[in-house]
Amino acid sequence: MITTQMWHFYVTRVGLLLLISILPGTTGQGESRRQEPGDFVKQDIGGLSPKHAPDIPDDSTDNITIFTRILDRLLDGYDNRLRPGLGDAVTEVKTDIYVTSFGPVSDTDMEYTIDVFFRQTWHDERLKFDGPMKILPLNNLLASKIWTPDTFFHNGKKSVAHNMTTPNKLLRLVDNGTLLYTMRLTIHAECPMHLEDFPMDVHACPLKFGSYAYTKAEVIYSWTLGKNKSVEVAQDGSRLNQYDLLGHVVGTEIIRSSTGEYVVMTTHFHLKRKIGYFVIQTYLPCIMTVILSQVSFWLNRESVPARTVFGVTTVLTMTTLSISARNSLPKVAYATAMDWFIAVCYAFVFSALIEFATVNYFTKRSWAWEGKKVPEALEMKKKTPAAPTKKTSTTFNIVGTTYPINLAKDTEFSTISKAAAAPSASSTPTVIASPKTTYVQDSPAETKTYNSVSKVDKISRIIFPVLFAIFNLVYWATYVNRESAIKGMIRKQ
């Protein structure tokens, strides 16, 4: 049974409900609420759901607020551990490189340094948005919250991402879900070198990069602008002292490993060594040393000290040059073009020394002055002892000149050379007196003699220069033609 108090409670409640329904600005059940001017924040902005659009003041309708909400919506539920298109399609990463500086190149370590802007572009359906701007520049901090390619450099020994004053990274998001990710890198990459043609050698230093974990069934790489324009080198980007950058060749490779097949992007930078330094430092000194060694062929064969100095000095000089030429090279097990040149020059210098030894050995008994052989040609005539005089004469007369005889020291016949020849044109007998016996000897015929020139020297004066000239002609012609062929091959590629 309903009491009076309960009846009054129900009547009061019904009355309040009727009063609320009659008041303006209220809606009954089934009626739509009238939109007020300040209620726009509750609508979808750029695809935002009402739960991501909290109430804000009426004056906060600028782009910053709009894109803040866009980013909040995009990252809500985004899993950066999963690549775009997982399970549906292969993710394509487009790349291009702008080289700001190339070099230096280390021959001993067989590596080079390159500074680049490395750009990557890919599409992520999860990051599509609709807003007042088509391209949204983002801070580099957002890169850690989204999926990015796990690109690494296959032949990189050391890579540095620049962080001064902030990380040198750029991230842009297009409204269709395309991302551009750029970073500045300094890469120390390996450059295999074949030094057989050193210092006229040409090298192709590679730069290889690709995905570390994703096979070609998951992630593939391609060049953004094609093979001809995707790698660009700044005009003032060369930092090479000993090389010329001839050009670069862009390509793509597939490598196979135990974990699958991977796409590898390749760029080969072709370098040509500058030979000027080595011409001044090695080639010219070697050539001058060989020429100096051949000067000894024009010296008298009796000039033993002079010719010995020429030979020994030039051999030691070539030894020093050969050692110094190897200091700037890695310790390779094969001979380079410079090694062959130095070896041939060393052979010429050493041959010149051997030539002098040969000439000296076979001609040492036929030296110049014929007067030294006079004692063998003298006709000794023993005369009857002269009548003794009161005083034995201790002097003898040679062509009107009186010389004292030292009986204690001159026990043998003295050698008479051209310096003691008579100035008279006639041949006058010379009388040699002694206390007991008088000898009469005929003077040698006055014939002026000269130092004879060895036939070996005469032949060497012609053979050595001609052979050395032919060697230089063949040597330089071979490597100059090879350089032209290599440059033509690079242009075709």
UniProtKB/Swiss-Prot annotation:
Residues in the signal sequence: 1-28
Positions of region (Disordered): 27-54
Residue spans, topological domain Cytoplasmic: 360-458
InterPro entries assigned: GABAA/Glycine_rcpt, GABAAa_rcpt, GABBAa3_rcpt, Gabra-1-6_TM, Neur_chan_lig-bd, Neur_chan_lig-bd_sf, Neur_channel, Neuro-gated_channel_TM_sf
Main location: membrane
Annotated disulfide bonds: 191-205
A GO BP entry: chloride transmembrane transport
Residues with PTM Phosphoserine: 427, 434, 443
Pfam families associated with the record: Neur_chan_LBD, Neur_chan_memb
Residues annotated with Phosphothreonine modification: 428
Cellular component per GO, a single term: dendrite membrane
Source superkingdom: Eukaryota
Tissue-wise expression: Expressed in most brain regions. Expressed in lungs, in alveolar epithelium.
Keywords, sorted A to Z: Cell membrane, Chloride, Chloride channel, Disulfide bond, Glycoprotein, Ion channel, Ion transport, Ligand-gated ion channel, Membrane, Phosphoprotein, Postsynaptic cell membrane, Receptor, Signal, Synapse, Transmembrane, Transmembrane helix, Transport
MF GO annotations: GABA-A receptor activity; GABA-gated chloride ion channel activity; ligand-gated monoatomic ion channel activity involved in regulation of presynaptic membrane potential; transmitter-gated monoatomic ion channel activity involved in regulation of postsynaptic membrane potential
Localization (cell): Postsynaptic cell membrane; Cell membrane
TM spans (from-to): 277-298, 304-325, 338-359, 459-480
Residue spans, topological domain Extracellular: 29-276
Domain notes: GABAARs subunits share a common topological structure: a peptide sequence made up of a long extracellular N-terminal, four transmembrane domains, intracellular or cytoplasmic domain located between the third and the fourth transmembrane domains.
Function summary: Alpha subunit of the heteropentameric ligand-gated chloride channel gated by gamma-aminobutyric acid (GABA), a major inhibitory neurotransmitter in the brain. GABA-gated chloride channels, also named GABA(A) receptors (GABAAR), consist of five subunits arranged around a central pore and contain GABA active binding site(s) located at the alpha and beta subunit interface(s). When activated by GABA, GABAARs selectively allow the flow of chloride anions across the cell membrane down their electrochemical gradient.
Subunit structure as annotated in this protein's UniProt entry: Heteropentamer, formed by a combination of alpha (GABRA1-6), beta (GABRB1-3), gamma (GABRG1-3), delta (GABRD), epsilon (GABRE), rho (GABRR1-3), pi (GABRP) and theta (GABRQ) chains, each subunit exhibiting distinct physiological and pharmacological properties. Binds UBQLN1. Interacts with GPHN.
Similarity remark: Belongs to the ligand-gated ion channel (TC 1.A.9) family. Gamma-aminobutyric acid receptor (TC 1.A.9.5) subfamily. GABRA3 sub-subfamily.
Protein name, per record: Gamma-aminobutyric acid receptor subunit alpha-3
